Amino acid sequence: ETGTFAYDEVEAMNAASTTGSKMIMSKAMNNHTWYGLLSTYTTKFGENFDFYGGIDLRYYKGLHQNVITDLFGGSYFVDIDNRKNVRVENNAAAADPNFKNQKLGVGDVIYRDYDGFVMSEGVFAQLEYNYDKLSAFVSGGLSNTSYWRYDRLYYDKAHAKSDKKHYLGGNVKGGINYNLNEYNNIYFNAGYINRAPMFDTSFINSQNSHARNG
């Protein structure tokens, strides 16, 4: 009711517990590494046409994990709520009855521990036309986006890397403009875009499973 948190009561509860801390604090870590290459070529065709084209390459790796930072008066923590979901066929360590009840301390990983990877390759082009009061353009692009993950908690080393899934995307756009005078113009643009889904929606649960949507 007061908007405060009774840490002393939590510490007393954890200290009295014979099965480890009931409440702890962990930090969510999300470390991102990006690399990219964008190269563009431009040229003219005659006096009225301008052409632009290029490639767009991108690579992403994201480390996602939760690490215990405070046991709040307890001596250890048991992450049974998450470890009970680790399947033996994915991680052989789960065959040990003690796996679910392993005593964890500050610095140990809970809940999630995986790397997410994204690789994208694309090409694009645009042709523009300009003559007097009239201008027009048409453009398009194609891309291939690949997603995969590497999990260190729910999967052992033999199964840690998921299969890659590739999504082909593309777009096409066009438009025309006519300047009626110095202050007024009329124009029309249209386009269609098909892009890859977000990384998280490629997996049923990207936090703990290689299983895919679709």
Name each model feature, range by range.
Residues N14-T33, F99-G122:
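Alpha-helix-centered segments that form part of catalytic cores
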